[in-house]
Each structure stands twice: as C-alpha cells, then as structure tokens.
C-alpha cells in the first residue's frame, strides 16, 4: 500500500509539472481552447485595433473599383456593394436605381481622405455619361458618397479642381451623403483575386467571411488586377517567388 501511494504521489507531481509546462507554452490542453487563443489569424498579421474611417465611391464596375484602392498604404479592408438608390435589398441582377460601389475602410493616421479622392479621380473617367468604358448603364455612374460636412467640402473642392483641368466637357460625378450601403453578393467580393486561384492558395483559401475583412486579401486583389504601384507589384512578385521556393507555406504578409 505504501509503495502504491508513493507511486501515485509521483504520478501526480509529474502531471502537475506537465500541466504547468503546457500552459506556459500555450499548448492545447484537454477540454480547453489552449493554443488557438491569441493565434494570428490567416490572411494577414493580426493588427492592433485602430479607429478606422470609411469612404464610399462609385466609379464604374465595382470589380475593378475595389482593386483600385486595395493596395494603398493605410487601407485596412475593402468591399463592394450597392448604394445611391431607393430600392430595398438590391441584388446584382436587380439593382433598381442603385450604383455599384466600393467601401474603403482606412486608418486616417496613415492615409488621408484627400488621397482617396485622388485615386477616385485617377481610376475612372468622370466625364463619361451613363457608364464607364464598355460598361453602359446607370449603375456605373460616378458618385462620391460623403459622411459629414468635412468630406462634402473636400469632395466639392476636388471636383472643382478636376473640372478646371478641362472646361470643354463637364464632370458628371455626383456628390451626395451616404445613405444605406448594401453589401454585394459574395461572388463579387475580391473578384480580381478570385480569378487567380494560385493567389487564393497562397493565403490558404480563406473562407468568404475572412476574404471580406482581410487586409492581405485586399492588397492581393489589387495585385491581381495589376493596380499596385510598380514597386509594390515587384515586391509582391519577389515575396511569392520566395514562398514558392520554400515549399508553399502560407503567405501572411506582403
């Protein structure tokens, strides 16, 4: 009996030591969440919580529009949807009077609203009427949606500046307060990225909800459309080549 009690006591001490080591190392323990807690999510490094601001623009097909903003430093996430109309619950095949839009969430410490306006003007032809390029229809009209008087003033000034570049034709861009924004269907989110299955594999084939919120996915969506700056495009090319040589680990940042 004494020998059995001693053995039981030793086993108990060993179990306690193993338990302490497991907790210290973050290992998964029976019945607990253990090592998953605090683990960096797929699709990009975990970012500290920041107070983001949101801008919404309509500048033609939202497939391309989303990519135009995704690679900008300070842009946290992008998504596409419908706004500017009166129809409740619009859908891609039944938009009503809405326009295709891109919603840009950004860190104002790293990028200013003025810069987003510059990209907006540079990414489409605001003098076209009833569409953009091959995309014809009211849903492709040019709109700056504003949130408050400061954005409205900046948008107005930027429009005047754009108009002054050429007085022979009129800027058709509307400026209006943002109302309801209806997210588009999942198949339209990160459209350019989804056309490159190779890139999706590099970030672990994220589920739709993670693609929607991932900063890395927003950047790769722009990269897939070749809308990052030349330096950024080259840097991502090098990063992808490096990953391929290492045996296809998950891409976590660029």
From Swiss-Prot:
The GO terms this record gives for MF are: L-methionine-(S)-S-oxide reductase activity; peptide-methionine (S)-S-oxide reductase activity
Family annotation (InterPro entries) = Met_Sox_Rdtase_MsrA_dom, Met_Sox_Rdtase_MsrA_sf, MsrA_MetSO_reductase
- Keyword Signal listed? The answer is yes
**Keywords tagged on the record:** Oxidoreductase, Signal
- Gene3D superfamilies per the UniProt record, alphabetical: Peptide methionine sulphoxide reductase MsrA (3.30.1060.10)
Annotated EC? 1.8.4.11
SUPFAM superfamilies, per the entry: Peptide methionine sulfoxide reductase
Q: Which GO terms describe its cellular component?
A: cytoplasm
Keyword Lyase attached: no
A GO BP entry is: cellular response to oxidative stress
Question: Record's Pfam families?
Answer: PMSR (PF01625)
Q: Which reaction does it catalyse?
A: L-methionyl-[protein] + [thioredoxin]-disulfide + H2O = L-methionyl-(S)-S-oxide-[protein] + [thioredoxin]-dithiol; [thioredoxin]-disulfide + L-methionine + H2O = L-methionine (S)-S-oxide + [thioredoxin]-dithiol
Question: At the top level of its lineage, which domain of life is listed?
Answer: Eukaryota
Its biological purpose:
Catalyzes the reduction of methionine sulfoxide (MetSO) to methionine in proteins. Plays a protective role against oxidative stress by restoring activity to proteins that have been inactivated by methionine oxidation. MSRA family specifically reduces the MetSO S-enantiomer.
Please report which protein family the annotation says this sequence is part of: Belongs to the MsrA Met sulfoxide reductase family.
Output the PANTHER family linked to this UniProt entry. MITOCHONDRIAL PEPTIDE METHIONINE SULFOXIDE REDUCTASE (PTHR42799), PEPTIDE METHIONINE SULFOXIDE REDUCTASE A5 (PTHR42799:SF3)
Protein known as: Peptide methionine sulfoxide reductase A5
Name the gene. MSRA5
């Amino acid at each position: 009996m004494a020998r059995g009690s001693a053995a039981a006591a030793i086993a108990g001490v060993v179990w306690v030591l193993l338990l302490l080591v497991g907790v210290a190392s973050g290992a998964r323990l029976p019945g607990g969440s253990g090592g998953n807690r605090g683990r960096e999510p797929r699709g990009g490094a975990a970012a500290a919580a920041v107070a983001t601001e949101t801008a919404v623009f309509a500048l033609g097909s939202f497939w391309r529009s989303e990519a135009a903003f995704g690679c900008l430093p300070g842009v946290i996430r992008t998504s596409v949807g419908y706004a500017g109309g009166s129809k409740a619950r619009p859908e891609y095949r039944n938009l009503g009077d809405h326009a295709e839009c891109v919603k840009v969430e950004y860190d104002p410490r790293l990028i200013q609203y003025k810069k987003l306006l510059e990209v907006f003007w540079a990414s489409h032809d605001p003098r076209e009427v009833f569409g953009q390029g091959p995309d014809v229809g009211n849903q492709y009209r040019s709109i700056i949606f504003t949130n408050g008087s400061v954005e409205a003033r900046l948008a107005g000034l930027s429009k005047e500046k754009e108009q002054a570049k050429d007085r022979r034709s009129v800027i058709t861009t509307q400026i209006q307060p943002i109302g309801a924004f209806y997210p588009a269907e999942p198949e339209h989110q990160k459209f350019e990225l989804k056309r490159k299955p190779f890139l999706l594999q590099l970030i672990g084939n994220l589920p739709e909800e993670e693609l929607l919120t991932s900063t890395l996915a927003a950047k790769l969506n722009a990269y897939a459309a070749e809308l990052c700056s030349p330096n950024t495009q080259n840097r991502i090319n090098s990063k992808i080549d490096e990953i391929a040589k290492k045996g296809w680990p998950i891409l976590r940042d660029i």
